[in-house]
């Protein structure tokens, strides 16, 4: 059981911090950057839960909005698990190369495969993609998009020192970004939101100047 009685130690005042084994490294160290990005993903997932819980799951007449309740249940369960897994991953990533303590509980193949199983279940409920999706939507959907992009940044950072970490950790993060993409689409569909699709340049409007002029003319 973790017991923390003091947070401020002054040990990081000069730009250094400790790895799990107590060794000191600069806060600009690539491994510390990775740990921080992992924490950033976790915080964004917390924001997804906040945004999801803001959506009313009752109709004006008091009846239950079944699809909204389902989104809340799935996100609370899945993201709650993911946040703990990311904490496990962050602890592992904060270890020096090839010096993971035997007592540490690590992300395993079952955790990684579970992401694929959940993706497959969600995809069964979705229409096939016919274009790229632009990152927009309501609070939970837009925040899921952001979490996905930060997860990709985490993956890119990990690749930079992949020889110093377990291949399974990198596999897990790669799958996690895909998982977030599919959950974003599933959440959008369950909330009856239209996805904003990419429009090729030849089909896009040239600008908004004409629209502004028409609006001004109709005042």
What do the PLM-derived regions correspond to, one by one?
Residues 1-219:
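Phosphate/pyrophosphate-binding loop motifs in nucleotide- or prenyl diphosphate-using proteins
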């Amino acid at each position: 059981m973790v017991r923390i009685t003091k947070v401020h130690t002054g040990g990081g005042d000069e730009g250094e911090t400790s790895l799990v084994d107590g060794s000191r490294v600069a806060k600009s160290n690539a491994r510390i950057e990775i740990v921080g990005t992992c924490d950033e993903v976790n915080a964004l997932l917390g924001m997804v839960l906040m945004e999801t819980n803001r959506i009313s799951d009752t109709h004006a007449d008091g009846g239950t909005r079944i699809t909204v309740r389902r989104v809340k249940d799935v996100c609370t369960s899945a993201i709650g698990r993911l946040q703990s897994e990311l904490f496990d991953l962050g602890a592992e990533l904060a270890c020096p190369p090839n010096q993971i303590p035997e007592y540490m509980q690590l992300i395993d193949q079952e955790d990684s495969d579970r992401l694929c199983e959940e993706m497959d279940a969600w995809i069964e409920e979705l229409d096939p993609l016919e274009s790229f999706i632009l990152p927009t939507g309501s609070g939970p959907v837009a925040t899921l998009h952001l979490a996905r992009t930060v997860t990709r940044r985490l993956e890119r950072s990990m690749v930079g020192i992949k020889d110093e970490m377990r291949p399974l950790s990198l596999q897990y993060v790669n799958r996690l970004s895909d998982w977030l993409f599919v959950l974003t689409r599933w959440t959008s569909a369950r909330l009856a939101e239209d996805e904003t699709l990419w429009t090729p340049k030849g089909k896009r409007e040239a600008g908004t100047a004409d629209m502004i002029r028409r609006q001004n003319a109709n005042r």
